């Protein structure tokens, strides 16, 4: 399956998602017992980005050489994501930093109160000053993974696999 080279806010995949999503959920139900599947929760207030990330990650499951496969849930509303969050269900959060109502750090602080073991990767289109961020948010919230948007598909997958290993 062909993957986009980069993830941009282009919105061209919305129609494709419904069909792909149903097929991918069926495939995952069959393979769920396999330990190489990891559950990813994406929260990004840009619907096109959230959908594109989901498509890219789940499409990468078709690569037989990839040792970790992804089961992805995406939200565009951090409050809804928090409300629906299931402790001990997700392996990794992929969260946009800048969102209205609740930023990515605030969301992760609340989620980590529910599930201390979930790993976190932050995304942003802005500059990343990790030292300043760690001073503002000194809790375990700040994981080792910061992803700058737009991101190359292969780089995104590599970073997520590294966090999950």
Regions inferred by a protein language model and the residue ranges of each:
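Two-component/phosphorelay signaling modules centered on CheY-like receiver
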Residues: 47-73
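Short amphipathic alpha-helix used as the core "switch/output" element in two-component signaling
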Residues: 83, 105-116
């Amino acid at each position: 399956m062909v993957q986009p080279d980069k993830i941009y806010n282009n919105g061209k995949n919305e129609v494709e998602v419904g069909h792909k999503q149903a097929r991918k959920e069926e495939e995952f139900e069959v393979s769920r017992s396999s330990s190489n599947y990891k559950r990813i929760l994406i929260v990004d207030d840009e619907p096109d980005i959230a959908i594109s990330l989901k498509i890219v990650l789940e499409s990468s499951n078709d690569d037989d050489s990839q040792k970790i496969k992804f089961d992805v849930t995406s939200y565009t509303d951090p409050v809804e994501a928090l409300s629906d969050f299931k402790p001990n269900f997700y392996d990794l959060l992929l969260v946009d930093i800048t969102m209205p109502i609740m930023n990515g750090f605030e969301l992760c602080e609340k989620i980590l109160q529910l599930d201390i073991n979930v790993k976190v990767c932050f995304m942003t289109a802005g500059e990343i000053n990790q030292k300043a961020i760690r001073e503002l948010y000194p809790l375990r919230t700040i994981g080792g993974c910061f992803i700058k948007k737009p991101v190359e598909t292969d780089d995104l997958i590599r970073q997520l696999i590294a966090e999950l290993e």
